A protein has these predicted regions:
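Long, charge-dense low-complexity segments
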Residues: 12, 16, 34, 141, ...
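Terminal low-complexity "docking" segments
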Residues: 1, 16, 158, 174-175
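Alpha-helical solenoid scaffolds in large eukaryotic transport, assembly, and signaling factors
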Residues: 67-146, 159-171
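Extended, helix-rich scaffolding/adaptor regions
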Residues: 1-77
Length: 175
């Protein structure tokens, strides 16, 4: 409801030619909400229509990024955990800036097991290829710049590049 109220106020400002200093902020909020909503709906559709994504989503329903980070910090990594982490990241709905930053911190942390970091990058890349996520794509670019581990940096750059090549430029002209 708040988004609709903001939208109505924005239209009133445009119609009456009022120069509200908060208008760009309101517009950015509406735009962000709409992008997030579209991403959620597209990912939901993929999960419903693709058996691999449905299985991945079902298997990782009880997991979140904080749990992944905590287990990686403890070094509590086994094949089952890596499969769950991959499934979670593959089917996650769009993250906010705080979660994306946490994701990048986990991946770039020198103490993070290489297998876990590489797997997280691969899952993010595959997810963003299936349902484009601009924020995840730019996060992979940031990981490329930020990581001190050459292999992680290269993997993030490859992920970013593959996402860039898979983007429909007509649907996303700002890319």
């Amino acid at each position: 409801q708040k988004v609709m109220d903001n939208y109505e106020k924005m239209l009133e400002c445009y119609a009456s030619d009022v120069k509200d200093p908060k208008l760009p902020e309101v517009y950015a909020g509406i735009k962000s909400f709409c992008h997030n909503l579209v991403h959620h709906l597209l990912m939901y559709q993929v999960i419903q229509n693709d058996s691999f994504f449905r299985s991945a989503s079902d298997s990782s329903k009880n997991l979140d990024l904080m749990q992944i980070g905590e287990r990686i910090e403890k070094g509590d990594i086994d094949e089952d955990f890596l499969n769950l982490a991959f499934s979670y990241i593959l089917t996650v709905r769009q993250w906010n800036g705080k979660k994306l930053s946490y994701f990048a911190d986990i991946v770039c942390n020198p103490a993070t097991d290489y297998r876990a970091a590489a797997l997280m990058i691969s899952a993010a890349m595959l997810s963003s290829i299936k349902v484009f996520d601009y924020n995840m794509m730019t996060t992979l670019f940031d990981i490329w710049k930020k990581s001190k581990d050459v292999k992680i940096s290269e993997r993030a750059l490859v992920g970013w590049s593959v996402i860039m090549m898979s983007v429909d430029s007509e649907q996303y002209p700002y890319i």
